[in-house]
Amino acid sequence: MDGTLWDSAAEVAESWNETVKRAGYDRKPISVKDIQSVMGKTMDVIARILFPDLEEGERQKLLAQCGEEENEYLRIHGATLYPDIRRTMEQLKKKYHLYIVSNCQSGYIEAFLDYYKLHDLIEDTECYGNNEKSKGENIALLYSCLLYTSPSPRD
């Protein structure tokens, strides 16, 4: 999603900084560049990079808080949608089934779809936060769910 449909780095950084401050974790502010450097990685890897000094349990707790508050923030404020995304998706939808697969936390895709009201264009979604599988594994998972039916035995 990030870098393809929208750019949420500034909004994610702002949201995470608020959460980190409330949680009392002492670190320099998370910059847009910090967020851009971890976009596309799975959430566990992002947490290890951004919160290296925390014990694993505390890191996961803070990561969960950041993800929840980020989702709510994005659902309310959105981010920078790339030009003509709705129109492009509508055109693609005429010929193709559209899915979103991401290495994000649960709820991130839904926050995007909610804010931009794009649910009608997407048939299914999957993400790391739902099942701890990478984007590649989740693409394979969605692909395995496809079923082709035909009245002709030759098909």
Locations of regions flagged by a protein language model:
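Alpha-helical substrate-recognition element adjacent to the catalytic core
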Residues: 22-54, 83
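Short, acidic loop-to-helix structural element flanking the phosphoryl-transfer center
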Residues: 73-100, 136
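Conserved small/polar residues in nucleotide/adenosyl-binding loops
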Residues: 148-155
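Metal-dependent phosphoesterase signature
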Residues: 48-84
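Active-site neighborhood of HAD-like aspartate-dependent phosphohydrolases
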Residues: 1-33
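Conserved phosphate-coupling serine/threonine residues in phosphotransfer and NTP-handling enzymes
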Residues: 4, 102-104, 152
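Substrate-recognition element of Asp-dependent hydrolases with the DxDx(T/V) motif
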Residues: 88-113, 128
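A short, structured active-site edge motif that brings together acidic residues
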Residues: 35, 119-133
